[in-house]
Amino acid sequence: MAVVTMKQLLESGVHFGHQTRRWNPKMKDYIFTERNGIYIIDLQKTVALLDKAYDYVRDMASKGKTILFVGTKKQAQETIKTEAERCGMPYVNQRWLGGMLTNFRTIKKRVKRLNELEKMEEDGLFEVLPKKEVILLKKERDKLERFLGGIRDMKNLPDVVYITDPRKESIAVAEARKLNIPIVSIVDTNCDPDLIDYIIPGNDDAIRAVKLISSKIADAVLAGKQGEQLTEEAKPEDKEDEKGQAEEKEVKEENNSANKEE
């Protein structure tokens, strides 16, 4: 069964591409037709490719892998935060800071600084410092929280990056490709599909379209995590089965020895 129905995609406006003069010829295979100067995306391909992306993300999540959600333009910011938090994954929904992946060591230092500032406030240190210094420290903390708050628990580089608009997030795409991190992305008619590993042809401007697709990626993470949990829960049982089989084998061997002696 498909992850989404054609009706859901139509209702969310996933089929609306960009104006025909603003297209990337490489997207030709994913375009159904043209209507009033706007390209209409082939939703049959969207259904099939979203299924493929869903399966991939679910499988990665089932192995305990990290999927980084990225969407910094206005239409995606709230959705990215909501869906990433819902499935317990890191996210970037404000400005992408250059080097977030390629210079991750420095980013980790900035996250450490954010944690230090928050601890200072919790410990009441802000109350004894000069007022001007506290204002500057709070300003620094707020800025770090805004840009790095979504990745503060990301201890290592992500295993997959999910992006809502590869043109807007061109730096994130370039960094992920440089580090050979697979990219799952919504790809509109003005994008280059060759840069993406798992493409989802669709409207990257409509809030409802971004929300629908992003929610399915989050669902895939949750389904994968549930599978991982079930596997871990099954492990003790497997050990019990192995123990039982060994004991059964031992009893059989003892019986055989007794029969031979008789």
From Swiss-Prot:
GO terms for cellular component: cytosolic small ribosomal subunit. GO terms for biological process: translation. One of its GO terms (molecular function) is structural constituent of ribosome. Keywords: Ribonucleoprotein, Ribosomal protein. Residues 232-262 have a biased composition (Basic and acidic residues). It holds the Pfam family Ribosomal_S2. Residues 225-262 are annotated as: Disordered. InterPro entries: Ribosomal_uS2, Ribosomal_uS2_bac/mit/plastid, Ribosomal_uS2_CS, Ribosomal_uS2_flav_dom_sf. Belongs to the universal ribosomal protein uS2 family. NCBIfam families: rpsB_bact. This is Small ribosomal subunit protein uS2. It comes from Halothermothrix orenii (strain H 168 / OCM 544 / DSM 9562). The gene is rpsB.
